A protein has these predicted regions:
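Beta-lactam-recognizing serine transpeptidase/beta-lactamase-like catalytic domain environment
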Residues: 1-15, 20-284
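Short, charged, low-complexity patches
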Residues: 155, 292-304
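Short, gly/Ser/Thr-rich active-site loops of penicillin-recognizing serine hydrolases
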Residues: 180-191, 299-316
């Protein structure tokens, strides 16, 4: 990745988008932390025969995560849960909410040509493609796929909002000649309204379970635990993402080596630590790298280890 990709490269964020969808579902009253959604391994829109399968679906049938709360939907990365949330929210409420995190606009303070990314709406699709918006478009956005596009800088800005418990600090890329930003006329941070402190704390906790939850059976373990959660000396909050680059017919069996490298999935991981009082937030994108937990998460841990442990920053 070249430096311009940080601010202008456009990518599907995959499951790293789920924390923001979850917060939107809380804000709009679609869910709470106790609601359970049945995940049999697939989702079906009302009146439709098409099955939208979860990543846990096993060829020949079966799979799924059982009864899923928002917290479990995070640490097991249940597509079915977030299909449900986005469908019930609807695209207008969903797109309006996530834009508050900087998605769909230039969220950088000092990079004029940074891309705005794309948070799609029915009006955008009609103008761009002269086509109607379908419910399937909405639920694809709910898992960070479809027409949705973000830059790595936007995702970094957004994850710091969660780390700051709702406080949006505009990102900046330029320092003065002395390597300082202290004298720059920066806009004041803003607080995303309507979300209680408890919901921010619960989302942070759910993201820590992505990394640290173990010893409860495979179907309850955090998706990143095996990759980075063992013997970690501080509490990290994170979320993995594996984003499709090209559409592959559902149910098709294939190996990554069957695809041209540029068509292979992108690996993402977003993280911050220490979770209780964050000192650093990290976004890792490995273009065409494969699974986020296996490929991108170890890079994120290496970066955070270097900052917190080797620089002697307090980790409590």
């Amino acid at each position: 990745m070249c430096s311009s990709d940080l601010t202008r490269g456009l990518y599907s964020p995959g499951s790293t988008f789920k924390p923001f969808v979850g917060l939107g579902a809380l804000r709009t009253g679609v869910t709470n932390w106790d609601r359970q959604v049945r995940d049999p391994g697939y989702f079906r829109l009302p009146g439709s025969r098409r099955l939208y399968r979860d990543w846990s679906w096993r060829r020949g049938g079966g799979g799924g995560h059982g009864m899923v709360t928002l917290a479990k939907g995070m640490y097991r990365s249940s597509n079915v849960f977030f299909f449900t949330m986005s469908h019930e929210m609807g695209i207008e409420r969903l797109s309006s909410f996530v834009s508050q995190f900087g998605f769909g606009r230039n969220s950088s303070f000092d990079v004029a040509d940074a891309s705005s990314g794309l948070v799609p709406t029915p009006a955008w699709k009609q103008q761009r493609y002269k086509q109607l918006w379908y419910s399937g478009d909405t639920i694809n956005i709910g898992i960070g796929q479809g027409f949705l596009l973000v830059t790595p800088l936007q995702l970094a800005t957004a994850v710091t909002v969660i780390a700051n418990r709702g406080r949006l600090v505009p990102s900046r890329m330029v320092m003065d000649a002395n390597g300082s930003t202290a004298d720059l006329d920066l806009p004041r941070p803003t607080q995303i309204p309507g979300i209680p402190r408890a919901d921010w704390e619960n989302m942070v906790w759910a993201m820590t379970q992505v990394v640290h939850r173990h010893g409860v059976g495979w179907d309850e373990e955090g998706t990143a635990y095996n990759g980075i959660g063992r013997h970690i000396p501080y509490v990290m909050a994170g979320k993995s993402g594996t984003a499709q680059v090209v559409e592959i017919k559902q149910g098709t069996t294939y190996h990554a080596s069957d695809l041209q490298e540029r068509h292979r999935k992108h690996a993402w991981f977003i993280a911050f630590a220490p979770a209780a009082a964050p000192k650093i937030a990290v976004v890792v994108l490995v273009e065409n790298g494969g699974g986020g937990s296996a490929v991108a998460a170890p890079v994120a841990r290496d970066v955070i280890d270097a900052y917190l442990l080797r620089s002697k920053v307090a980790v409590r």
